Amino acid sequence: MGKFKSHIFLCFFGTGVLTNLNQPIFKIVEDLSYTNSGNHRHKLDLFLPEGRTKKNDLPLVVWIHGGAWQSGNKKSGRNSHRLPRVLKTGRYVGASIHYRLSDEVKWPAQIYDCKAAIRWLRGNAEKYGIDPLKIAVWGSSAGGHLASMLGVSSLNKELEGSLGSFSNISSTVQAVINYYGPSAFLKMDDFPSKIEHHSA
């Protein structure tokens, strides 16, 4: 796990191969459903490197959007330069996931959705050239919180849920990147913000 995480961080902050971000060298497969619910929020986008010369499976980096659990969508994985910067290296497969928001369902539905997405991605790893033992989750704000929850709850059956057709597959992740996601919920609204998190 340590080696994989270090490798990811080096790619995030390297600059040698991260130019021309407007000309992606990856194929985007949109709106893949990771459950059989029919809910438009139960979808993800997949980013597959073009021109792969090696047949070995690649690590997967999963982006989880922020928005105080009240807003946001999977398009942020493409619109922000964060995930594309990593994928431009050609060393990773990427995914950006939707999850249900707090105006539709209450916690822990959001982590159920994220875990269902991880199970689906791992269940389809061979199809998309993903190494099922090297899955990292990366999120900002509320997405950072959900990434952290994925990292610490792999043995917690109460947070697993039963969504999707891969309930027998592990939702464990090997690396977590929490980008300013909250951990002290009783304190986070003590600081100025455009969003009232307590309303989520």
List PLM regions with ranges.
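N-terminal cap/lid segment of alpha/beta-hydrolase-fold proteins
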Residues: 17-56
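Short beta-to-alpha linker loops that shape the active-site pocket of alpha/beta-hydrolase fold enzymes
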Residues: 50, 67, 93, 98-102, ...
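Short amphipathic alpha-helix adjacent to the substrate-entry channel of hydrolases
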Residues: 75-95
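Serine-hydrolase catalytic-loop signature spanning alpha/beta hydrolases and amidase-signature enzymes
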Residues: 68-71, 75, 94, 120
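Primarily recognizes the serine-hydrolase "nucleophile elbow" in alpha/beta-hydrolase
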Residues: 116-192
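Short, solvent-exposed loop/turn and secondary-structure capping segments
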Residues: 57, 72-75, 107, 149-150, ...
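Short beta-strand element of the alpha/beta-hydrolase
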Residues: 56-68
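A fold-wide structural signal in alpha/beta-hydrolase
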Residues: 60, 88-98, 136
